């Protein structure tokens, strides 16, 4: 009797099919329209397949997580499969269409294969590296002696369009490892040979995908055929070393992107244009906010007066809030002896990210990469009782980390930066309330600076990988339950990510969503079971015994530099009135109005406004234009009528001419906007 399997659909419906039925056939049994719309399937089964295979991939091979991409998936975990995959066991099945985000990633993976197919047809001497999907599209690494030119990229894109129309099916096959090695060795595909040899074992079957004459070592899945790839573009070319090692040959990395429709593709590039306009590196120079000076070194920020003013506002607000919320402000040294970093573990586990030691008075010192050990030393400077806890230390501390030159990016990734670090030392009973307070503080930071949307992730441990975590099971369970309870008390939806916690404790990451819908990781609340043990922290409990305090790290800006970079891009440099480095530009119509303009300047500055007066002997429109380009919130114009009436003619950023107002009335309105930290003008 033919074996039957049960397929459970997302709505709970259970259907029975012969073993070997494909997801596409399941879709056809439901509706021909669904079968045509389906792109890929998600299945979950607790029964392993009859044969064990090792799936290929297009990942680099530098880390364990990358290596895992080459191994067979856990048969009990949800996984994506081709619509042509035979179903041999009972499964839960979801058919994904173009509306599902996971389907887009599959499309882009297939587009990477399409691009590699085109490259080999046009440039047969090329050797293949790997080609994954990314959040923004896809790329593929190639090795060839001759560099690709801009004209080549156009040719490749054109050939991709031709291949897409051929409607070649993406076909998966499993072949013996030795047969696959022989096939790729025959073509001198040294990178594919490396992947197979490193991530598969002798005697195993390996997974290949073919479309037309193209073949790749790959785990998939893919769209059914090339004609599903309709809207794509080859975007740019970059260099990448084979296996990320500068001693290896340099590869040429072609980037592209793909969508299910031309409309989505066009919207994507319109969004990229808007992102380019908001680039904080461009606006930082245009608005004279900051610079990076080559003679001083990469990743080191020079804050110009206007940028420094915003930084001061950010730091002053943060310090005032910390004091209001019960934190004690502290300052710790920029350099400390290596012995401290050995005790903390940084010297052994983090030294590659630290600047090299300097020798002073027969002792080695290092620039601090983190503020935590300094705060711990202050805590240890006197005996502590349970009555003293919680102790909350806050510092806007400068830290220094060695970042590779290729990883730095404007303000977003630098070598020297300022962290709004705080460390809370408390009893186990106080944990939940302290975490609630940290979350409340984080929400206040984001909303005050105009970020009304954010996402929260809770990173927990993998209890099956116990040896890789510091702290007892009881401590981990208490910390995780406290974080969960705190988020529940605040009514915040969150996503739990098992196995993503640092070795020293679970954490909450708060990712803000900017005006373009981009996610930015900034605020973190992090438990630490490692440092209290390393530094032998103690307090005397109510029972008279010595106990180890719970230690919580929290950073809300993350770093002042990164937060400022995100602010620039979020507002496109048009900062809200309370945050703008210059709030008001003053334009006297002619030289005879300068005296009145100076009087207005004095009154505004006395009221606390940041003002710039254009004294140049230029035409009024030129002055207005210059202030507008600098994105000042207000431009006030003064002529005969304004001088006689004690008024100003108001131009508001983004709204234009607002007419004449008595100066006192303008001051009152603007003061209210500043006091409420309003984003309106």
Curated annotation (Swiss-Prot):
Main localization category: cytoplasm
GO biological process: threonyl-tRNA aminoacylation
Cofactor requirements of the protein: Zn(2+)
Region (Catalytic): 279-576
Molecular function GO terms recorded: ATP binding; metal ion binding; threonine-tRNA ligase activity; tRNA binding
Cofactor note: Binds 1 zinc ion per subunit.
Catalyzed chemical reaction(s): tRNA(Thr) + L-threonine + ATP = L-threonyl-tRNA(Thr) + AMP + diphosphate + H(+)
Top-level class of the enzyme under EC nomenclature: ligase
Keyword line: Aminoacyl-tRNA synthetase, ATP-binding, Cytoplasm, Ligase, Metal-binding, Nucleotide-binding, Protein biosynthesis, RNA-binding, tRNA-binding, Zinc
Boundaries of every TGS domain copy: 3-97
Residues reported to bind Zn(2+): 372, 423, 553
CDD domains attached to this UniProt entry: TGS_ThrRS, ThrRS_anticodon, ThrRS_core
PROSITE patterns reported for this sequence: AA_TRNA_LIGASE_II, TGS
Location of the protein in the cell: Cytoplasm
Similarity-based family: Belongs to the class-II aminoacyl-tRNA synthetase family.
Classification via HAMAP family: Thr_tRNA_synth
Protein's recorded name: Threonine--tRNA ligase
Species of origin: Acidobacterium capsulatum (strain ATCC 51196 / DSM 11244 / BCRC 80197 / JCM 7670 / NBRC 15755 / NCIMB 13165 / 161)
Gene that produces this protein: thrS
């Amino acid at each position: 009797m033919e074996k039957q399997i049960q397929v459970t659909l997302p709505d709970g419906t259970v259907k029975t099919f012969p073993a070997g039925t494909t997801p596409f056939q399941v879709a056809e049994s439901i509706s021909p329209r669904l079968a045509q719309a389906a792109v890929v399937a998600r299945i979950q089964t607790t029964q392993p397949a009859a044969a064990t295979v090792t799936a290929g991939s297009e990942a680099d091979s530098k880390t364990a997580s990358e290596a895992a991409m080459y191994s067979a998936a856990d048969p009990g975990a949800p996984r994506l499969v081709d619509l042509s995959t035979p179903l041999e066991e009972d499964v839960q099945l979801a058919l994904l269409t173009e509306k599902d985000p996971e389907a887009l990633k599959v499309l882009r993976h297939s587009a990477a294969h399409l691009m590699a197919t085109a490259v080999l047809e046009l440039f047969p001497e090329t050797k293949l590296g790997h080609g994954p999907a990314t959040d923004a599209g896809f790329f593929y690494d190639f090795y060839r002696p001759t560099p690709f030119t801009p004209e080549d990229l156009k040719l490749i894109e054109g050939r991709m369009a031709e291949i897409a129309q051929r409607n070649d099916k993406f076909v998966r096959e499993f072949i013996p490892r030795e047969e696959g090695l022989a096939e790729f060795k025959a073509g001198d595909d040294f990178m594919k040979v490396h992947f197979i040899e490193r991530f598969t074992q002798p005697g195993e079957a390996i997974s290949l995908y073919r479309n037309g004459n193209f073949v790749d070592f790959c785990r998939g899945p893919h769209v059914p055929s090339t004609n599903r790839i309709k809207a794509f573009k080859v975007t740019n070319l970059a260099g990448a070393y084979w296996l990320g090692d500068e001693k290896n040959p340099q590869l040429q990395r072609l980037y592209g992107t793909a969508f299910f429709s031309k409309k989505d593709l066009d919207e994507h590039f319109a969004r990229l244009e808007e992102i380019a306009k908001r680039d904080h590196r461009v606006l930082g120079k245009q608005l004279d906010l900051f610079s990076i000076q080559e003679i001083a070194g990469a990743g080191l920020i020079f804050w110009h007066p206007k940028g420094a003013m915003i930084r001061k506002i950010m730091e002053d607000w943060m310090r005032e809030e910390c004091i209001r919320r019960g934190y004690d402000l502290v300052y710790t040294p920029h350099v400390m002896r290596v012995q401290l970093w050995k005790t903390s573990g940084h010297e052994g586990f983090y030294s590659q990210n630290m600047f090299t030691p300097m020798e002073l008075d027969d002792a080695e010192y290092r620039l601090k990469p983190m503020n935590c050990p300094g705060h711990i030393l202050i805590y240890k400077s006197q005996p502590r009782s349970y009555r003293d806890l919680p102790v909350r230390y806050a510092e806007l501390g400068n830290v220094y980390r060695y970042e590779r030159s290729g990883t730095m990016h404007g303000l977003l990734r630098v070598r020297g930066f300022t962290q709004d670090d705080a460390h809370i030392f408390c009893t186990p009973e106080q944990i939940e309330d302290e975490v609630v307070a940290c979350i409340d503080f984080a929400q206040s930071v984001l909303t005050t600076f105009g970020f009304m949307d954010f996402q929260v992730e809770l990173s927990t441990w993998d209890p099956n990988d116990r040896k890789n975590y510091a702290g007892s099971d009881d401590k981990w369970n208490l910390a995780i339950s406290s974080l969960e309870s705190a988020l529940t008390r605040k009514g915040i939806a969150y996503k739990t990510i098992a196995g993503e916690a640092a070795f020293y404790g679970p954490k909450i990451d708060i990712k803000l969503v900017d005006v373009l819908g981009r996610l930015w990781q900034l605020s973190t609340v992090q438990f630490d079971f490692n440092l209290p043990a390393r530094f032998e922290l103690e307090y005397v409990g109510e029972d008279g015994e010595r106990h180890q305090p719970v230690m919580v790290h929290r950073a809300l800006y993350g770093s002042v530099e990164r937060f400022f970079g995100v602010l620039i891009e979020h507002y496109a440099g048009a900062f809200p009135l309370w945050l703008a480095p210059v709030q008001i530009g003053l334009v006297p119509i002619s030289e005879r109005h300068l005296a009145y303009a100076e009087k207005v300047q004095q009154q505004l500055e006395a009221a606390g406004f940041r003002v710039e007066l254009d004294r140049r002997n230029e035409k009024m429109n030129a002055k207005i234009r210059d202030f507008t380009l600098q994105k000042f919130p207000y431009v006030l114009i003064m002529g005969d009528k304004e001088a006689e009436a004690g008024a100003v003619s108001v131009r508001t950023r983004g709204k234009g001419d607002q007419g004449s107002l008595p100066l006192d009335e303008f001051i009152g309105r603007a003061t209210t906007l500043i006091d409420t930290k309003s984003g309106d003008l």
